[in-house]
Amino acid sequence: KVMRIRLYIILALSLLTSSVWAQNRLQRPEIFLGVHGGVKASTMFYNPSVKNLDILHSPLTGNGGLVFRYAEHRVCALQIECNYMQQGWAELYGSDAKSGTLYTRHLHYIEIPFLMHIGLGKKNFRGFFNLGPQIGYCIAEETKISNPGATISAQKQHDPITNRFDWGAAAGLGCYYRTNKIGVFQLEARFSFSLGGVFDVGQLHYFKMASPMGLSVNLGYLWEFKKRK
């Protein structure tokens, strides 16, 4: 009897979800293409741990790219991006930033996020949530030392990276304003975390984990190719 009740509940919820989904389907798909860009702070999660600056005290870098969004539903859409971004980490040698030496490592990536875009609110002004996986490839790396005359002992994390391919996940919160004639303006804060590693990781290697993580704030502009009737 309990199993039968559960089946009835599941069936009722399924029918309700299908009904809501059908009612919120658009008469015709919406297609957006645009650009976005902003600043990003990043750090690294190491195991064994490495003393690097946390994400809120790391130097800011730039990021930006193209945005494609496809929607057949009022709430959910698919968003694919192609971005250039920098991530890495910073290490402070000394008691403070003024008297000490800052070692900064920047990794330059081309990344492609595949995101589920969920929008809530009124037609013109809406909040949204983005969530999904992303892949990337490191096209260059650079090292900066604030005091070139300083002596910094070489450590494992100072070696050239061994894994240029990156994969991970991203989640963002934001809002946008949709005008009637000149497109969509949006603001988003996004957190990303790599599930791979910039160095070889595992039981046979020095690092068990060497994963970048970042927090970015971006402004964007999207143009709608098809207007709703």
Task: List each language-model region with its residue ranges.
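Short glycine/serine/threonine-biased micro-segments
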Residues: F32, H36, N63, N130, ...
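Predominantly the C-terminal beta-signal and adjacent terminal strand-loop region
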Residues: R164-D166, A171, Y177-K229
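Bacterial Sec-dependent N-terminal signal peptides
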Residues: K1-F32, H36, L215-K229
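Residues that define the transmembrane beta-barrel architecture of outer-membrane proteins
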Residues: P29-I31, S58-G62, H106-I110, F125, ...
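Short glycine/proline- and aromatic-enriched beta-strand/turn motifs that initiate or cap beta-hairpins
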Residues: A22-V67, E224, K229
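Extracellular loop and loop/strand-boundary signature of outer-membrane beta-barrel proteins
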Residues: S49-D54, A97-Y103, A154-I161, Q203-M209
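Short helix-loop boundary/capping segments
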Residues: G149-I152
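Gram-negative (and chloroplast) outer-membrane scaffold detector with strong preference
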Residues: Q23, Q27-I31, A41-F45, R69-N147, ...
